[in-house]
A protein has these predicted regions:
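Non-catalytic N-terminal targeting/anchoring module and adjacent flexible stem/linker
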Residues: 1-8, 41, 45, 208
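A short, structure-level motif marking secondary-structure boundaries and short turns
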Residues: 28-29, 50-51, 57, 166-168
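S-adenosyl-L-methionine-dependent methyltransferase catalytic module, highlighting the catalytic core
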Residues: 30, 89, 103, 115, ...
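A structural signal for well-ordered alpha-helical scaffolds and beta->alpha junctions
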Residues: 36, 40, 62, 175-182
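Conserved SAM-binding loop
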Residues: 41-155
């Protein structure tokens, strides 16, 4: 009797998510390819090399990345600054996302690996954000960052550049970092860059 009731309740709980999934399936349209295959490919190559037990994903948003990492066996925590960056609220149906500001994190755990995929460019206090992530690493831990990059010049918001093809009416900035920012991120820490990959997805000088 208890088992039957439990199964019935589970079916009721699944009605909403199933309806949303079916609706998304029916309404999907191809728009363009993006950089995620490159970024996720790098993340999962590093997972296979590092084999981290505890992983923190910073700035998850609505993505499925923490669920995919969890499927690899890792213990995963996902965070996002929901209050400030998602004024209308945000719900991730793939994974539980904690509300936490990485520039002033309240998390006390330490992690073997931290991922921050296409997020740091949208955080104005990027120095505090990177330092916050470094502080959450275990000794010998790894931080994976992906972001727009221009070796010689920092750009505060590539969406504002003349001829920009993206980012119109978006309520947040998209920074392109230079070597200066990278070096400053590492100042006063025991961290070092162990691997970098560069990809050009736009035909201009900047990410736009």
């Amino acid at each position: 009797m208890v088992s039957t009731l439990k199964n019935y309740l589970l079916k009721l709980l699944h009605i909403g998510p199933l309806w949303v999934c079916k609706l998304e399936f029916k309404l999907q349209k191809f728009t363009r390819f993006n950089e995620r295959p490159i970024e996720y490919g790098f993340v999962f190559r590093k997972l296979a090399q590092i084999y981290p037990c505890k992983v923190l994903d910073v700035g998850t948003g609505t993505t499925a990345l923490p669920r995919l990492i969890r499927n690899c066996g890792c213990h995963v925590t996902a965070i996002d600054n929901i209050k400030d960056y998602w004024p209308s609220g945000m719900f991730n149906r793939f994974y539980y996302v904690m509300n936490d500001d990485i520039t002033n994190s309240k998390i006390v755990d330490k992690f073997d690996l931290i991922t921050c995929v296409s997020v740091i460019e949208h955080i104005e206090q990027h120095y505090a954000a990177v330092r916050g992530m470094i502080n959450l690493l275990k000794p010998g831990g790894y931080l994976i960052l992906t972001c727009p990059y221009t070796e010689q010049k920092y750009v505060r918001n590539v969406y504002d550049l003349p001829g920009s093809n993206s980012g119109k009416n978006i309520p947040f900035i998209c920074q392109s970092y230079s070597r200066i920012e990278l070096n400053k991120w590492l100042e006063g820490t025991n961290c070092k860059i162990v691997e970098q990959e560069y990809w050009q997805l736009w035909d201009g000088d900047y990410w736009t």
